[in-house]
């Protein structure tokens, strides 16, 4: 059984906000959404794998040594809509009570992930507004050392391509184990994706129809395998995708391939 640590695809809705007077307002209600439940359920559907799904803010608040423990304990780590600031900043940097007492530093999460992949941890990078380079460049993956273990090259500017009519995909490597039992021609409309470029030495398994833009790409870095999917495995881009008949099988295939050696 593979153990998967899945970061991202959670959201909190705060409000609505009621302004009762010019000097008083109240936030009424808090609702937490786990948009990652579809991917978690899909991967676990075979009964062979176990997924721990955590919000991005839990990843951000891991204490020193916390990510090291995760990378040691889990076979696969998934990042979906996790902008680079969550790797590069730490809560202590904004705690004024700690200022001036001693130099504030934190273990480099990017470096830890890169080193873990070379030792044999496997990664999945998923698309979204805060993935790859992302909306207004907020994703920022390509501006970090993560680019060393990405099987695609990020653009240097906003990379979102969206359509209310959606996009289709086509397999360029239909014989790859990812597509075992999968017919990509039945894929429902995908409402957006991150535009990236193929990376030399890595494999593009599928492209977005009518383009050369990678949809699925893979790479081997040291002992670890990495899979990139350039759209979102969850709503909103994936609001049709999660109800596709082949959705669960696709992600089971993905994990099986990653850990298959």
Over which residues does each language-model region extend?
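An acidic, glycine-rich "communication" segment
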Residues: 1-2, 9-19, 118, 122-210
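Hydrophobic targeting/anchoring helices
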Residues: 1-32, 64, 207, 230-231, ...
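Extracytoplasmic/secreted proteins, especially bacterial periplasmic and envelope-associated proteins
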Residues: 34, 38, 108, 112, ...
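Helical hinge/lid and interdomain linker segments adjacent to catalytic or ligand-binding clefts
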Residues: 22-137
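Extracellular ligand-binding/catalytic regions of CAZymes and related secreted enzymes
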Residues: 1-8, 12, 122, 200-203, ...
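Active-site-proximal beta-strand/loop segments in catalytic clefts of secreted hydrolases
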Residues: 7-10, 56, 79-83, 126-129, ...
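Catalytic cores of nucleotide-enabled group-transfer and carboxylate-activating enzymes in metabolic
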Residues: 45-48, 192, 223
């Amino acid at each position: 059984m593979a153990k998967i640590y899945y970061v991202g695809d959670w959201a909190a809705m705060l409000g609505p906000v009621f302004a009762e007077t010019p000097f008083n307002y109240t936030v009424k209600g808090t609702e937490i959404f786990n948009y990652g439940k579809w991917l978690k359920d899909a991967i676990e559907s075979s009964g062979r794998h176990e997924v721990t799904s955590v919000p991005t803010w839990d990843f951000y608040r891991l204490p020193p040594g916390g990510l090291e423990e995760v990378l040691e304990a889990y076979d696969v780590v998934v990042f979906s809509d996790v902008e680079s600031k969550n790797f590069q900043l730490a809560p202590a940097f904004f705690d004024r009570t700690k200022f001036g007492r001693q130099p504030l530093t934190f273990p480099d999460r990017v470096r830890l992930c890169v080193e873990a992949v070379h030792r044999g941890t496997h990664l999945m990078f998923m698309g979204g507004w805060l993935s790859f380079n992302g909306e207004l460049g907020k994703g920022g993956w390509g501006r970090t050392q993560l680019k060393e273990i990405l099987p695609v090259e990020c653009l240097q500017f906003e990379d979102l391509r969206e359509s209310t009519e959606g996009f289709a995909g086509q397999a360029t490597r239909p014989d790859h184990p990812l597509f075992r039992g999968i017919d990509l021609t039945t894929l429902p409309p995908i409402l957006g994706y991150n535009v990236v470029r193929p990376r030399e030495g890595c494999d593009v398994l599928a492209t977005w129809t009518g383009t050369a833009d990678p949809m699925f790409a893979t790479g081997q870095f040291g002992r670890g395998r990495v899979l990139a999917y350039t759209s979102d495995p969850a709503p909103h881009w994936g609001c049709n995708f999660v109800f596709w008949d082949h959705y669960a099988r696709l992600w089971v295939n993905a994990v099986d391939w990653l850990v298959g050696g």
